[in-house]
Amino acid sequence: MYKENTNPLVSIIIPCYNYDQYIEKCIQSVLNQTYKSIEVIVVDNGSTDDSLEKIITFSHDPRVVIIELKENIPPGSGTNSAFRIAFNKSNGSYIGVLYADDWYLPDKIEKQMELFSQCASSVGVVYCHGYRYFEKDKTKIEFKQQSFRGYVFKDYLKEGDVVIPISPLVKRCCYEIIGLNNLWTG
């Protein structure tokens, strides 16, 4: 576990299966966050390309935890899901999921943690807008979902597409209360 200061620890879980062309940029985008109290849990989910070799290049960083699964475990595999394995290894009070072909803007976590600090303690999840980036022609499109308020976390877990998948930052206790027994979380 890595904790640089007294700010709450944020764990970012990165599941990876055959994304060797993107994984380095993905991991680096978390390590370059302006919010410094982070740990990165990278799960190589049985990749058959060079993903694991690229992930291992980050093993020198104390903020990075690497989990190697010998074979691919698909979502919804119950107690053996890659997300559940990573969640159980994480130490953060807040959990984010970043897919291996995506990346964060440098101040994403800082802005979300600032928002948490301004909200009532009953708020369990905050999310943000994002961009869709098309590498082939180097274009980006702002991607916004409608705003939700109230007790939406259970619906978020069940529906899985209420917000941009990589945008939520969730209090650990929400996962512990709701559980990890669905397709999205395993």
What are the language-model segments listed below?
Residues 147-186:
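Conserved nucleotide-sugar donor-binding catalytic segment
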Residues 29, 44-53, 71, 99:
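A conserved acidic beta->alpha catalytic loop
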Residues 52-85, 89:
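Conserved donor nucleotide-binding strand/loop of the catalytic core
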